[in-house]
Amino acid sequence: FKSKRGVILMSSEEKPYQIWIGRNYANCSGCRRCEIACSLHHEGRIWPEASRIRVFMLVPTLEMPHLCAQCDDAPCIPSCPVGALSVNEETGAITVDKDKCTGCGNCIDACPGRVPVIHPTEKYALICDLCGGDPQCVKVCQEGGYNALWVVKREKKSVSYKLYAKEPKEIVKELAYKFYRDLAEELV
C-alpha cells in the first residue's frame, strides 16, 4: 500500500527482497567455521559431513566454500520424482521436505554445481536453506574477519546467480589460473 506521500510501503510480513550468500573465494582461509556453524544449526552438533556448505581444497592454499547458488530456474526442483524440493517464497532458498525425499540423488545430477549431498545417516538431500533467512555460515565468517561470505539482499528473482553454480574443480581451476598463472597447469 502507499503512504500519503506516495511512497510504497510493505506490510511487516512481506519483505521486498530475498537473500543470497555472496562469496569471495580469495578470502576463504579454509577454517571451516562455516561447516561447523551450519551443522550446529541444523543438526544440533558439530558434524561437518551433515553441513549444507562444504569447503574444498583441491589445490594447496586454495580453499573454497561450496553451497547452493539459489539458481533462478532451480533445475533441482523438477528433477525430484517425489516433489520433495520447493522454493521458500520468503527467502528464495530451496527447501527439502525430509519426509518426502528418498535420497535418490536426482537433484545432485540436475544441479550444475553438484551442490546437494545426501545426509550421512538419513535418506534425504542436504541443500542450503539460508537458515530461514539468517545464514549462520555468514555470521561466523564475518565474525572471524575473513569476509569470504556475506548476505546479499536482492529483489525477488531479479538476478540470476547461476554463474556460481559450478563444481568445485571448475572453481578451483579458475582460482589457480588467477593466482598461479603459468604454474596453474601443474597444480590442477
Task: Write out the residue ranges for each language-model feature.
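Short, Lys/Arg-enriched N-terminal segments with co-localized hydrophobic residues
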Residues: 1-9
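Flanking helices and flexible, charged tails adjoining ferredoxin-like Fe-S electron-transfer domains
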Residues: 9-18, 59-77, 99-188
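N-terminal cysteine/histidine-rich coordination modules
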Residues: 10-28, 32-59
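Nucleotide phosphate-binding site architecture
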Residues: 29, 86, 102
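The C-terminal cap of the DNA-recognition helix in HTH/winged-HTH DNA-binding domains
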Residues: 40, 81-82, 112
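Ordered, amphipathic secondary-structure segments that act as subunit-interaction surfaces
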Residues: 72-87, 91-93
